[in-house]
Amino acid sequence: MTILSGTTAAPRVNGTTMNGHSKPHTNGVHLNGHAPKATTESPWPQSEEKTLLDKFVEAYYEFESYKSGQTVKVDGKTLSLAGVVAAARHHAKISLDDSASIKDKVVKSRKVIADKVASGASVYGLSTGFGGSADTRTDQPLSLGHALLQHQHVGVLPSSSQPLDVLPLSDPMSATSMPEAWVRAAMLIRMNSLIRGHSGVRWELIEKIAEIFDANITPVVPLRSSISASGDLSPLSYIAGTVVGNPSIRVFDGPAAFGAREMVPSAKALASHGIDPLPLASKEPLGILNGTAFSAAVGALALNEAVHFAMLAQVCTAMGTEALVGTRLSFEPFIHATCRPHPGQIEAARNIYNLLEGTTFASVHHEEVHIAEDQGTLRQDRYPLRTSPQFLGPQLEDILHAYVSVTQECNSTTDNPLIDGETGEIHHGGNFQAMAVTNAMEKTRLALHHIGKLLFAQCTELVNPAMNNGLPPSLAATDPSLNYHTKGIDIATAAYVSELGYLANPVSTHIQSAEMHNQAVNSLALISARATVNSLDVLSLLISSYLYILCQALDLRALQMEFVKGVEEIIREELSLLFASVVSPAELEALTSKVLSAAQTSLDTSGSMDAPARMKKMASTTTIPLFDFLTELTLPDAISSGIAMVSIPSFRSHLASRATALLDQLRRDYLSGQRGAAPASPYLNKTRMVYEFVRLTLGVKMHGSENYARFAKGLGVEDETIGQNISRIHEAIRDGKMQAITVAMFA
């Protein structure tokens, strides 16, 4: 708390201190740009393990290298989640590692299978039935492969892409088939598994899948039907069906367009690209199907987004601390690195602490005051800000563990049986059981809910005038009787976080015995990954809504900084004009302090009033301190006393009218753009990047110009809807543009 005149706590108006003797500053950084020399020694401990932030930044720069032309290498051991995203969603080129050591493993494992077939040995998947029917025998391995694909092509898909006679309850394609990005990611991951040389397939098969992938031919794969037990059998069968050119298997082909591309039979698509179908040899149908590629694919794509959202949550928390004029002290190293050194908690605290470096709005030091000086004042921030490292930290740890686990899954052999090409041994196991992915997705989805819950709590505090340290109700930039700006967002975010809570429920507790009780336990990994994508969809809505609110709140804080300074100047001018002739300079300063305190108290409790009535009320509250102060003074004569008393009504009138005019002028200047498109920028430091990205790059303006004009031109003529502005932020989050900004903030 800033001290006025050495002894008296300076009043605050709308969460901002009225103190004309000094410029606002924090962390030793003044608005005039001068700052003390920075120390090079970090107060935070150095970790030998990579943090989630490390993974996030590394993945971003790796992803950028793929966008610049570097190929995603398929070698069975180095495929990253960034590589999966780049190839699946952004059409980065892939390259098979055809080095002698890699190809030799594939060739050797294939020779083991060929030798077993030639010798007539009984081997699972070569001469036996599948799963619970493994007690059957056949000496026709090629027909056995056809039978495998046939019984797995059970997905329910639209029979036509033509318009329907009856409007559907839900979109026929999205309700039944996977997005192309999921399928492309699965193709890539399956190639990466097969190239490890443990599945007994030919090199030509891996090349054929790569050729189809490069041609941007994407199988139409059913959204449902996998329990991720013996791998994602049915979804992967559609990739196998495309490889062989099954005319009943359809694919997406043709130029990209808004919405789905053209659906055509796989044989037609292959022919149009000059690609010959590849008949599958013995064991190869099983080699394609028996794996976790779809679970790992959707999990990888989901985690890429989840890591970004976890970083954005910390950015939002830093901005929320500024918008609520909170304190950086909640994130001090002593609290987290010394007293409770959980890795995730330390990471979250360090990141938020660093983001608040150089802030103007948040306090950076603690000043002790006497009990009498801070009656009714919170000595610490509320839980959503103060305990955010403790709340976010475990989520960062869980997402990091999931990230590592799914990365490992993308570089594993998930097949059965497994072939050791060096010894000729065939191993029967269960690497297709995708519980590693399930656990990763369950903890990620729960973490996403907790992140959403924290941001929702911050958001509701920010729009509530009883908790937001002097901001107007619903962050209305104009008179609140005709401006309910964020009320709809407040309701919407409650819907979002409620849905996140529902989605956070575990999927794996619903496992059912399947396939003649052979798959008595299964992972449901793909279902869990799909649910996690749904959570990401919802959380992205909440984050974009909160970012929109944060930018509005920061603009209002900037406006109030000017308003507070102006009100103080008005009070000083009017008091000097009316009372300087009857009181001493020291007495005038003491009187000014009491009047400022009364003005602050009034403004902090009258935010729901329109400006004229609010300023009139503020002015009226100065009567008692003025009267009490003047009656306690020993004035030189009755004339002086009379002058002082009759001047009180004039002071009130002038203060109310001038403060009303000042607030109106500031509102007009801010909403019309006269203060610039990003008026809060001078008050921000590291968080300025995301604020200016929203305001300048995305063109999301401060809200309230329609309200200021009393809707003279109607709705939507001068301003887009609130939802349209939030949609711009949402699109930037989902298409990767915001990710670049987030990385730059932490770099």
Curated annotation (Swiss-Prot):
Q: What is its EC number?
A: 4.3.1.24
Give a short account of what the protein does. Answer: Catalyzes the non-oxidative deamination of L-phenylalanine to form trans-cinnamic acid and a free ammonium ion. Facilitates the commitment step in phenylpropanoid pathways that produce secondary metabolites such as lignins, coumarins and flavonoids.
Region annotated Disordered, chain positions: 1-47
Q: Where in the sequence is the active site? A: Y124
- Please list the residues that bind (E)-cinnamate: N290, Q380, R386, N416, K487, E515, N518
Similarity remark: Belongs to the PAL/histidase family.
Which GO BP terms sit in this record? cinnamic acid biosynthetic process; L-phenylalanine catabolic process
Pathway(s) it belongs to? Phenylpropanoid metabolism; trans-cinnamate biosynthesis; trans-cinnamate from L-phenylalanine: step 1/1
Keywords for this protein: Cytoplasm, Lyase, Phenylalanine catabolism, Phenylpropanoid metabolism
Null mutant: what phenotype? RNAi-mediated knockdown results in delayed primordium formation. RNAi-mediated knockdown in mycelia results in resistance to H2O2.
Here the segments flagged for biased composition (Polar residues) are 1-20
In terms of superkingdom, the source organism counts as: Eukaryota
Q: Name one GO molecular function term.
A: phenylalanine ammonia-lyase activity
| Positions where 2,3-didehydroalanine (Ser) occurs in the chain | S230
Location(s) in or outside the cell: Cytoplasm
What is the protein's given name? Answer: Phenylalanine ammonia-lyase 2
Organism of this sequence: Pleurotus ostreatus
Q: Catalytic activity annotated for this protein?
A: L-phenylalanine = (E)-cinnamate + NH4(+)
User: Could you describe the subunit structure of this protein?
Assistant: Homotetramer.
**Cross-link 5-imidazolinone (Ala-Gly) maps to which residues of the chain?**
A229-G231
Q: Which gene encodes it?
A: PAL2
